[in-house]
Amino acid sequence: MDFIRTLHGDISKEELGFTYSHEHIVCRPAYWQERGEDDLLLDDKEKSKRDVLDFKQHGGRSIVDATAVDYGRDVQAVQEIAIETGIHIVGTAGFNKSFLWDAKIKEELKPLTGDYASYAQWIEAKSINELADFVIREVEEGLEGTPFKAGQVKFGTGYNRITPLEEKTLRAVARAHHETKAPIHSHTEVGTMALEQIDLLKSEGVELSYLSLGHMDRNPDPYYHEQIASTGAYMSFDGIGKIKYAPESSRISLILELVRKGYEDQILISGDTARKTYYKHYDHGLGLEYIISKWVPRFVDEANRCGFDGRKLVEKFFVSNPASCFSFKK
């Protein structure tokens, strides 16, 4: 029977409800911490929790926290937020992109990773299968030595390139997926290298209906999006609210173009809210409430004007598609 794995246990697909598919809730990325980039440190549990409560008060039910081991997870804090707010939170095993790996591994992780100074040294030293075993344990036993298990496995690649170490983690994540049946999520830098990621996953025998590709709206190319969608993978439009990259009209146009081509069952929506200045209760940003309270009504209006049923599409993007995408299909 299919199920969703959250930080507080496995639930049925029907329990997931309205879902943001790619967020960050509490994290202290070592790479940014070492460089004094305070805006990228979501380091106050109570402030993060207040934003999660805003999301809940507007009808939100679940959040996928896409924070991997190399991005400074605080598993305990995020699990406590899930319990205290009543929101389902899906945790993430695996890895991010390689430029983050110059950072030092925190001491409390070394019993799990080994005594390596940096993430790059660890990943280089281990075999693909050893890295896969690490990811499998995060899904089946718990994240970072806690009893709280990951509900998806993740890898990442860089801008217009895939380094040898990134390919190594991709293959490790693919093998962990085969062992656990966990859904796979990928970081694409500025929406690039998705097709190359897909080719590598296919070489590992991955069925692409298990895959969601992040940051698709950062590369606003309808032809490229159609090529990706035709593989059967899910596409995450997770830059909602980030007008510095593109206006909302651009994202909505890209999404509706995929709907016109018949790919509405493969679209996921979120905000990738990973800075203090994006959060309402850290620094007066739009906050986690923005998509559900402001963007959704606008999308419904634009979709209806274009001849679609906007409400039906919202139900797909935020409820039925996440329930399918993030399922363990046993």
Regions found by a protein language model. Give the residues of each.
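Glycine-enriched alpha-helix->loop->beta-strand junction motifs that scaffold or abut catalytic
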Residues: 86-87, 180-183, 202-210, 227-236, ...
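Alpha-helical scaffold segments that flank or form the walls of functional sites
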Residues: 17-26, 34-88, 128-148
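Divalent metal-coordination and catalytic microenvironments
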Residues: 22, 63, 177, 235, ...
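Active-site gating/metal-coordination segments in enzymes
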Residues: 80-84, 88-90, 94-180, 234, ...
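Histidine/acidic-residue-rich catalytic or RNA/ligand-binding cores of hydrolases
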Residues: 29-33, 75, 101-103, 193-200, ...
